[in-house]
Regions:
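Active-site Gly/Thr loop motif
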Residues: 1-6, 10-70
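Structured C-terminal helix/loop/strand segments within mature extracytoplasmic catalytic/sensor domains
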Residues: 50-104
Length: 104
């Protein structure tokens, strides 16, 4: 017996609005310049409208609407901070999205 979980279109639209880039710019996230935060989602504010849920040890759900891509990263990084892996994780997610966009 499979259960289905659906997120309402209204909830997704609310998340996609993003948060205040001005407020976020005052935070301590140097790798995330130009981003915002809304409803527990980190908004890249990139051309693809990508957004991500981030766990403290590198767990990630990365959604890129333009590339029709969802990446789920299960992780247990020894450092309890995403800044420990952002330098390679974030460019990797973008590279996969860029590649997928070339295949459409």
């Amino acid at each position: 017996n499979e259960e289905k979980f659906e997120i309402s279109k209204k909830a997704v639209e609310d998340i996609e609005k993003g948060g205040s880039k001005e407020a976020f710019a005052k935070s301590d996230h140097p790798m995330l310049k130009g981003w915002s935060y809304r409803d527990m989602w980190w908004m890249t504010e990139n051309a693809h409208g990508a957004f991500t849920a981030r766990g403290v040890y590198g767990q990630t759900i990365y959604i890129d609407p333009k590339a029709a891509m969802v990446i789920v990263r299960l992780a247990s990084h020894p450092v309890a901070a995403n800044s420990a892996n952002d330098a390679y994780s974030l460019p990797a997610y973008q590279a996969v999205a860029d590649y997928l966009k070339t295949k459409k």
